[in-house]
């Protein structure tokens, strides 16, 4: 299972945190708020998210960027 954290990143602070379990919905949210938000993708192990995200997604100059951790 995967969990997607939709958030506003301000420096090292996370604000406006929302949780989604569907990739398509997370990407729709990101498209809507692409100037200010990012999506962090986590694996879920034994009912809880892993310590670190697997991927992060954000827009830079209207181009979707995917970062692998």
Predicted stretch roles:
Residues 8-11, 21-42:
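A short, charged, amphipathic alpha-helix used as a generic interaction element across diverse proteins
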Residues 15, 32-69:
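Short, mixed-charge low-complexity intrinsically disordered segments
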Residues 6-9, 47:
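A generic structural motif
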Residues 1-5:
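Short structural boundary motif marking the start of a folded domain
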């Amino acid at each position: 299972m995967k969990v997607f954290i939709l958030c506003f990143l301000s420096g090292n602070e996370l604000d406006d945190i929302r949780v989604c379990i569907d990739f398509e919905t997370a990407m729709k949210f990101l498209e809507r708020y692409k100037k200010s938000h990012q999506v962090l993708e986590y694996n879920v192990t034994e009912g809880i998210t892993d310590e670190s995200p697997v991927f992060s997604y954000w827009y830079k100059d209207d181009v979707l960027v995917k970062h692998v951790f």
